[in-house]
């Protein structure tokens, strides 16, 4: 791997494996190396290459301001078969530009964006981590040909044009990485690949689900107070959370759906600035469970109901209060409802410390 890193540093082209296809890399801050890569690929001179990094945190060197959705997708999808085109309004603020000078802007950035890939392959990770300079890469084939999935395919395409080809065996996936462009409205898929549109939506959102029996008392209170707490932390209105990819829901394991929240619950959450007016009870189902990233149940019985519906739900389902149940205030006094709301509110504050939004 040291040889490959040295060759890249010297401006040579090096082929290496990723989890999807074999790539051919070049030093990104060298106009000569980029020109050679474009010639070998037979690529349009105006078409940019994707930057390749050895670790997810390296993206901060190139993208100075990451949106919440961008941070979320980096945390969940990298390393992995996803190339992300980030908007960069001011490349001059990027650490790499401060390090190498403004002349690298035209080499790394294209029309206010930069495409970045963080491969999930040990060879790629080690190679990229050893090179102190920015590295771009593209599939190791000439334009119009199929990307190679093994070293023989690389040599059949590029033998004599590259300084080194590193053999990492056959690639794990048969398809290419997905290419997605992030924007203010979410994302746009530029190339279909291993990561589906459905997976992308999951990567970009956080879904919290609270479960009780009838979805008229405990779980609606939890939903309303959780939504209010997150909105306050985010500096937005509760009904704007969906625009930020944050969804807080509740459901009842024994609910037929359709009913409003109980009067006691509506009144109790007002003490915390939350609003339950307009709540409509929902029945717990597999779709809600599968969509959720975090499921908090009021009792062990509710937790068992979740597991019964989706046996492989894993550790994303937990009791809201670890080790004990939250008693049902249904039919009780206003004091019973307020006591329950206080208990749930305190538990939510602790649980939110565990959740990265």
Annotate each PLM feature.
Residues 1-211:
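Active-site-adjacent structural elements in enzyme catalytic cores
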Residues 41, 226, 230-234, 306-310:
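Conserved hydrophobic residues forming the short capping helix/wall of the S-adenosyl-L-methionine
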Residues 134, 164, 247, 275, ...:
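Conserved beta-strand segments of alpha/beta enzyme cores
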Residues 204-290, 353-357:
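Conserved active-site segments centered on acidic
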Residues 37, 59, 154, 222, ...:
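Hydrophobic packing residues within well-ordered alpha-helices of enzyme cores
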Residues 54, 250-254, 320-324:
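A short, structured active-site edge motif that brings together acidic residues
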Residues 162, 292-293:
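Short, well-ordered alpha-helix to beta-strand connector turns
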Residues 97, 104-109, 135-137, 141-142, ...:
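Phosphate-binding/catalytic loops
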């Amino acid at each position: 791997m040291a040889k490959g890193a040295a060759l890249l540093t010297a401006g040579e082209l090096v082929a290496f494996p990723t989890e999807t296809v074999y790539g051919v890399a070049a030093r990104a801050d060298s106009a000569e190396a980029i020109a050679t890569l474009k010639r070998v690929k037979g690529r349009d001179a105006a078409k940019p290459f994707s930057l390749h990094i050895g670790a997810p945190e390296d993206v901060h060197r190139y993208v100075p301001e990451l949106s919440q959705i961008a941070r979320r997708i980096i945390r969940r999808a990298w390393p992995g078969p996803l190339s992300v085109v980030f908007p960069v309004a001011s490349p001059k603020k990027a650490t790499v530009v401060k390090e190498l000078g403004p002349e690298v802007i035209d080499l790394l950035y294209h029309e206010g964006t930069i495409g970045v890939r963080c491969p999930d392959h040990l060879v790629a990770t080690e190679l990229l981590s050893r090179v102190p300079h920015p590295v771009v890469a593209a599939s190791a084939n000439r334009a119009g040909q199929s990307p190679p999935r093994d070293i023989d395919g690389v040599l059949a395409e590029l033998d004599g044009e590259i300084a080194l080809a590193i053999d990492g065996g056959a690639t794990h996936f048969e398809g290419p990485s997905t290419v997605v462009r992030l924007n203010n409205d979410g994302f746009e898929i530029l190339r279909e690949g291993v990561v589906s549109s459905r997976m992308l939506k999951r990567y970009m959102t956080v879904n919290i689900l609270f479960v009780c029996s009838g979805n008229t008392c405990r779980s609606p209170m939890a939903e309303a107070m959780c939504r209010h707490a997150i909105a306050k932390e985010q500096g937005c209105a509760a009904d704007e959370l969906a625009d930020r990819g944050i969804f807080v829901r509740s459901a009842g394991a024994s609910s037929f759906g359709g009913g409003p929240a109980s009067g006691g619950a509506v009144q109790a959450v007002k003490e915390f600035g939350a609003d339950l007016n307009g709540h409509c009870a929902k029945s717990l189902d597999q779709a809600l469970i599968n969509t959720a990233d975090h499921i908090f149940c009021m009792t062990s019985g509710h937790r068992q109901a979740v597991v019964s519906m989706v046996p492989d739900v894993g550790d994303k389902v937990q009791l809201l209060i670890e080790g004990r149940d939250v008693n049902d205030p249904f039919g009780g006094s206003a004091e019973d409802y307020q006591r329950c709301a206080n208990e749930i509110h305190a538990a939510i504050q602790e649980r939110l410390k565990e959740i990265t939004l």
